[in-house]
């Protein structure tokens, strides 16, 4: 069966051999703001005066938007990543499979809807994850749904329906395939039978599409001694940059190398490479608490190699942020600021000689005496933000400030007086809840036929008052990052451009002394570790 890719639209369709007249589409700009799908496509051949012809030997097909929408033929449109050759190749393979009649297979693992796509011969090609079937989403096929797109999800700093763009963002940020993230795209798939709560299948769905990676195990089935230091370091470097909130053993695939047998690999003899997948819970809207499964693995304590240090040194957080603005301009600016802060922290920490484990520790919150305390990175950001919004940059004594921070770190818990310390915080650190849903949520909600009146737009004042009555007052930030029983994060999206510049200046002034004056306290236990030791 012949399938072609149109260079203007990245759409695929079967050839129509009944017509030799080409119907051309006007060149419109794709709306990366996710995807305002109501954009009308112009069919220049609609005019009777249009006599544009190709060679009569070339079978032409209609790429008219109206014809595609009215046709029951499966097809795919690339919405994000279309400039990347590996993405276009992946989508071409998947398109050939689905127009040949391949059916998506729902995978039993995981909380969300993930579908395996195969060729006619049964070879695995890719895994598709519709955004309306994410964990907690209203169309979840595994009974864990109920929320509309745009509401806070499993992590309060990442909204339901926004995991797909983060999957693509992680791939775009993996320069030269350094961390081995599989090719990933964001696509609109039409007339393919995914799960739908209604009696009829939806005409189309937006989904992330990631190339399937053949593997022997996941990291949870082996002890960490089986993995190469290089693989652990490269995954860790990516996780730190994007502040991965969910790097557990199940989303690191294990590939044996050097033709090792299963017994050798499972006994921890030799080496195995890791492939990271599932990046839907990275780039949160605020500085949240990450989870790094590798934090206590011995490989993470090994110093970085010269190649790794050179790669880290060459990272440009501002160019990375601009890349995501270009490819995914619907991603929140606050998430891009998290990327910038974490990348700067990684670069400075690596240059100061810290290992991956030490860097991860300083980004991770600790639990002491049943209470969760702020991470070193959060403390730094809170102080830098307070300095920026108050405009007292020039008068700050950075050395004395960091001495106070070190004293707080020794205690392990931050207990402040509600009536004194909290009132001294600048008003801008206590900003209200979002009064509207970001544009991506609105567009996707419309796409999935979610009534706008179901979007989250109010805040439970009773919950807020209860939080204020608690004796343990934690770092103030944007309330969208607050779960009822979770610690708040540091929110950067409420700062103006000038304040953001002042924040970065203050942050970079505080950072060297913070890294120099703090020492690793050794590995600390992490709940949920699934690897053998």
Swiss-Prot record:
Catalytic activity, as annotated: a 1,2-diacyl-sn-glycero-3-phospho-(1D-myo-inositol) + ATP = a 1,2-diacyl-sn-glycero-3-phospho-(1D-myo-inositol 4-phosphate) + ADP + H(+)
**PROSITE patterns reported in the protein's UniProt record:** PI3_4_KINASE_3
Name assigned to this protein: Phosphatidylinositol 4-kinase gamma 8
Chain positions recorded as ATP binding sites? 108-114, 129, 210-213, 278
The entry's function note states:
The phosphorylation of phosphatidylinositol (PI) to PI4P is the first committed step in the generation of phosphatidylinositol 4,5-bisphosphate (PIP2), a precursor of the second messenger inositol 1,4,5-trisphosphate (InsP3).
Region G-loop: start-end pairs: 107-113
Q: Could you name the domain of life of the organism this protein comes from?
A: Eukaryota
For this chain, the family text in UniProt reads: Belongs to the PI3/PI4-kinase family. Type II PI4K subfamily.
Q: What EC class does the entry list?
A: transferase
Q: Name one Pfam family in it.
A: PI3_PI4_kinase
**Residues annotated as region Catalytic loop?**
243-251
Q: Does the keyword Transferase apply?
A: yes
The EC number(s) given in the record are 2.7.1.67
List the gene name. Answer: PI4KG8
Q: What is the lineage of its organism?
A: Eukaryota, Viridiplantae, Streptophyta, Embryophyta, Tracheophyta
Instruction: Give the UniProt keywords, A-Z.
Output: ATP-binding, Kinase, Nucleotide-binding, Transferase
Question: What's one GO MF term for it?
Answer: 1-phosphatidylinositol 4-kinase activity
Region named Activation loop: 276-302
Looking at the record, the residues that make up the PI3K/PI4K catalytic domain are: 101-397
């Amino acid at each position: 069966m012949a399938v072609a890719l149109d260079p203007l639209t990245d759409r695929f369709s079967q050839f129509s051999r009944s017509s030799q007249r080409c119907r051309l589409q006007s060149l419109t700009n794709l709306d990366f703001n996710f995807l305002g799908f109501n954009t009308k496509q112009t069919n220049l051949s609609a005019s009777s005066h249009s006599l544009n012809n190709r060679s009569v030997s070339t079978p032409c097909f209609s790429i008219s938007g109206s014809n595609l929408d009215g046709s029951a033929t499966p097809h795919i449109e690339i919405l994000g990543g279309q400039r990347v050759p590996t993405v276009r190749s992946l989508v071409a393979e998947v398109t050939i499979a689905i127009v040949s009649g391949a059916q998506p297979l729902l995978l039993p693992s995981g909380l969300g809807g993930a579908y395996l796509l195969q060729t006619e011969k049964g070879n695995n090609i890719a895994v598709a994850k519709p955004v309306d079937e994410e964990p907690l989403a209203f169309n979840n096929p595994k009974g864990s749904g109920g929320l509309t797109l745009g509401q806070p999800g499993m992590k309060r700093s990442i909204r339901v329906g926004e995991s797909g763009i983060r999957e693509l963002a992680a791939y775009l940020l993996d320069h030269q395939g350094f961390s081995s993230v599989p090719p990933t795209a964001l696509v609109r798939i039409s007339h393919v039978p995914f799960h739908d709560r209604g009696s009829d299948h939806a005409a189309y769905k937006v989904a992330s599409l990631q190339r399937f990676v053949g593997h022997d195990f996941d990291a949870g089935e082996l002890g960490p001694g089986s993995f190469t230091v290089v693989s652990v370091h490269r995954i860790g470097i990516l996780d730190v940059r994007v502040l991965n909130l969910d790097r557990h053993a199940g989303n690191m695939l294990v590939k044996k190398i050097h033709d090792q047998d299963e017994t050798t690999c499972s006994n921890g003899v030799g080496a195995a490479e890791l492939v990271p997948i599932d990046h839907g819970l990275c780039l949160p809207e605020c500085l949240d608490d990450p989870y790094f499964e590798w934090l206590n693995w011995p490989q993470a304590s090994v110093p970085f190699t010269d190649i790794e240090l050179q790669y880290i040194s060459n990272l440009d957080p501002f160019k990375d942020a601009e890349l995501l603005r270009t490819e995914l301009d619907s991603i929140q600016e606050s998430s891009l600021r998290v990327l910038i802060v974490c990348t700067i922290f990684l670069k400075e920490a690596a240059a100061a000689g810290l290992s991956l484990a030490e860097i991860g520790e300083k980004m991770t919150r600790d639990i002491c005496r049943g209470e969760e305390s702020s991470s070193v990175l959060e403390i730094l950001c809170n102080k830098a933000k307070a300095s920026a919004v108050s405009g007292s940059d020039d008068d700050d004594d950075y050395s004395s400030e960091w001495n106070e921070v070190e004293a707080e770190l020794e205690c392990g818990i931050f207990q402040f007086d509600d009536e004194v310390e909290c009132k001294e915080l600048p008003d801008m650190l206590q900003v209200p809840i979002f009064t509207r849903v970001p544009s991506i949520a609105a567009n996707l909600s419309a796409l999935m036929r979610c009534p706008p009146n179901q979007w989250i737009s109010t805040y439970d004042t009773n919950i807020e008052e209860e939080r204020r009555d608690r004796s343990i007052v934690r770092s103030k930030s944007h309330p969208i990052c607050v779960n009822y029983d979770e610690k708040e994060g540091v929110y950067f999206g409420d700062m103006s451009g000038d304040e953001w510049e002042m924040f970065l200046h203050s942050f970079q002034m505080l950072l060297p002394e913070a890294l120099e004056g703090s020492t690793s306290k050794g590995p600390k236990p992490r709940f949920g570790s699934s690897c053998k030791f």
